[in-house]
Amino acid sequence: MSEKTFLVEIGTEELPPKALRSLAESFAANFTAELDNAGLAHGNVEWFAAPRRLALKVANLAESQPDREVEKRGPAIAQAFDAEGKPSKAAEGWARGCGITVDQAERLKTDKGEWLLYRAHVKGESTEALVPNMVATSLAKLPIPKLMRWGASDVHFVRPVHTVTLLLGDKVIPATILGIQSDRVIRGHRFMGEPEFTIDNADQYPQILLERGKVIADYEARKAKIKADAEEAARKIGGNADLSESLLEEVASLVEWPVVLTAKFEEKFLSVPAEALVYTMKGDQKYFPVYDNAGKLLPNFIFVANIESKDPTQIISGNEKVVRPRLADAEFFFNTDRKKRLEDHLPRLQTVLFQQQLGTLRDKTDRIQALAGWIAGQIGADVNHATRAGLLSKCDLMTNMVFEFTDTQGVMGMHYARHDGEAEDVAVALNEQYQPRFAGDDLPSNPVACALAIADKMDTLAGIFGIGQHPKGDKDPFALRRAALGVLRIIVEKNLALDLQTLTEEAVRLYGDKLTNANVVDDVIDFMLGRFRAWYQDEGYTVDTIQAVLARRPTRPADFDARMKAVSHFRTLEEASALAAANKRVSNILAKATEPLNDIVHASVLKEAAEIELARHLVVLRDKLQPYFADGRYQEALIELAALRAPVDEFFENVMVNAEEKDIRINRLTLLSKLRELFLQVADISLLQ
């Protein structure tokens, strides 16, 4: 069977830059699935993406499906014919579905009986006939949140479409996709190269587009070129470019022919906090800031043009003129804001609503102040500094700088607090109160900052759950999942002695009578324990390990973590599976017991050697392990408990638990309950698979 290279390119208006990669990857994944489902043999499926095009190139695509033999078994002969030998309705319906009559069917004899059988040789369809619908289906499945319609057409897509190129080798596959008739025409760069040209063979792509159209269609190659050229440009001025992955991706999605240039701004603007300048350069203008080797911002920036100009100085000058007013605004806001102390903004917080039922930002500030102080007392942080940080925590939201450059909240609070002469850990806390902002983000660096960050997040959790607006499905407008995980990460990774029970109760208490959900404390704790499940699954822990610990509902996060590590280690022991099975058996036996058990195991009632030996082991371990449990040394405790495997096995092999004599039966059930209680001090081992 012959094979050829296949090419599809969809030429569009400028595609959304932040979605470009996902669109291209989804297109490739969807089309690959279509090929596989159709049974079309193929080689590598390569995707290309630039601002005005999505393309796929498939190597070694078979020109048709392979022929195949089809067999369809019908009803058994006994059900296929009536007593007179006439075909039944079931047989006739099956035959119609196969496109034959009953008398044309073959018969299949097996050891289990005889059935009607249809056999056929089906010729594979040509790739040319199959591909148009496969491309259309792949495009229809793209993750596009909002579709566009253009002109008088009813066609919808992410952006208007101008060209559709469909080539199998050197042949155009005729089709109408997204309202456009397929052709071999490709459009080049808007301002360079040939605006439009034809491609003779799919193998010429993307090289022909590079040479004639001045477009680097290979997304990764374009991104790598930007990165390398920007690094070289920064090196030439003695600096290091801030090439964050997200901005690199966005810039690579904005240009088809990247030309990296270096510009500068006035040094006087360096008196403004670097974060505000960087926000302007990266967020608004998509520029790459440049730092010296000490990490200090330089008065330069690197940007990427989408054209190779004969006079790049004009482009540089134009970008410098664009950014200057924004930097001047930042300078003005910074100087204006410093004329007031942070504390002077407190009254204005009363004018901003946090949530209609929960009050204003000033109300939230008062709660955070009290809760941060309480947390500081629990974890050994400076209580006065924590309450001060809580009082000032939202004041920077009222400043000109944060109003204009919203992403600078927190960091500007830190700078203004330093200007006001606040304690350094207070100033740092104002910046770090929102950490961690995302998975893998840094945690607050000092105890005061930890207290403030936890207080802010717990106040939100308690309040929103307290009015019954917990997350539903994918909707989480108050980012409660992120807040809960942030609290857990801080407590666990900083090893803080905080209990979710008392922490949540204190956060709820500070709301007074504003909350309407009587179960708010339990709801918040259950929600946070649920975030533990997601966290530990991401860390690679098995679901049953997590369930075993969750069954005990430990509310101290650091304690939860210790139990997780202990159970995970226990699973590696040779005795683990047998003891897990024994615990499951014990759990089932106790669940069926209807008689009240004794408080203690009565030694005088023990008869069999195996139960006497098990009881002896339990007494020894109970006394030995109490300090382990008290200190959270769960891993050591489970290692000791592993020694119970032999006496437990002996017990179940030689002792009848449900003895006829009531005293003996209840004593043995009590013995098993004491065994289970020891393991439950750590986790419910019976849930391990």
From Swiss-Prot:
Keywords: Aminoacyl-tRNA synthetase, ATP-binding, Cytoplasm, Ligase, Nucleotide-binding, Protein biosynthesis. The keyword NAD does not apply. It is an enzyme of class 6 (ligase). Its main location: cytoplasm. GO terms for cellular component: cytosol. Its EC number is 6.1.1.14. It catalyses: tRNA(Gly) + glycine + ATP = glycyl-tRNA(Gly) + AMP + diphosphate. GO terms for biological process: arginyl-tRNA aminoacylation; glycyl-tRNA aminoacylation. It comes from the Bacteria. It is found in: Cytoplasm. HAMAP family: Gly_tRNA_synth_beta (MF_00255). Belongs to the class-II aminoacyl-tRNA synthetase family. This is Glycine--tRNA ligase beta subunit.
